């Protein structure tokens, strides 16, 4: 299993605000969050209590364009959300956001888990060819900028 993790401290907002934003995000809000990089993010199919929601997202991470559907496979309100990536079939890839409130704001841990369990782990070295050091660096820089920018947006919405 390949794990790509970035921790970002964002002042002035809460974990609940981050999770709520992600659960209710529209294409317009996503594009405003990072114009030209965030292209689309919206819920296609909503489930009771949001577990199982199907979303579509389209964005650039560095020079790579990532277009996927994602299904919420885990949700802890105000704390954690996990999407499993889907591209025709469920992929062995998950995007996790873990949020923890602190005295001045929230710490967001952005984690991508890519790979197989059990016997499928033998295929992980092939995945590692796609997930090289350059992508790891781009993803880390991306998450740092992205969540600081989200903090600015959520603060602006709050102060209206």
Region locations from a protein language model:
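Hydrophobic ligand-binding cavity/cleft-lining segments
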Residues: 1-47
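Short, highly charged C-terminal tails/helix-capping segments
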Residues: 38-44, 144-160
């Amino acid at each position: 299993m390949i794990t790509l993790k970035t921790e970002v401290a964002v002042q002035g907002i809460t974990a609940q605000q981050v999770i709520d934003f992600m659960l209710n995000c529209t294409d317009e809000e996503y594009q405003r969050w990072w114009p030209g990089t965030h292209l689309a993010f919206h819920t296609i199919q909503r489930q009771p209590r949001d577990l199982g929601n199907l979303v579509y997202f389209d964005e650039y991470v560095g020079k790579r364009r990532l277009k996927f559907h994602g299904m919420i496979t885990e949700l802890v309100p105000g704390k954690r959300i996990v999407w499993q990536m889907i591209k025709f079939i469920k992929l062995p890839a998950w995007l996790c956001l873990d949020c923890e409130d602190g005295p001045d704001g929230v710490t967001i841990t952005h984690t991508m888990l890519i790979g197989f369990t059990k016997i499928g782990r033998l295929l992980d070295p092939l995945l590692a060819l796609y997930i090289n050091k350059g992508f790891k660096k781009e993803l880390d820089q991306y998450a740092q900028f992205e969540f600081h920018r989200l903090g600015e947006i959520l603060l602006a919405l709050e102060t209206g």
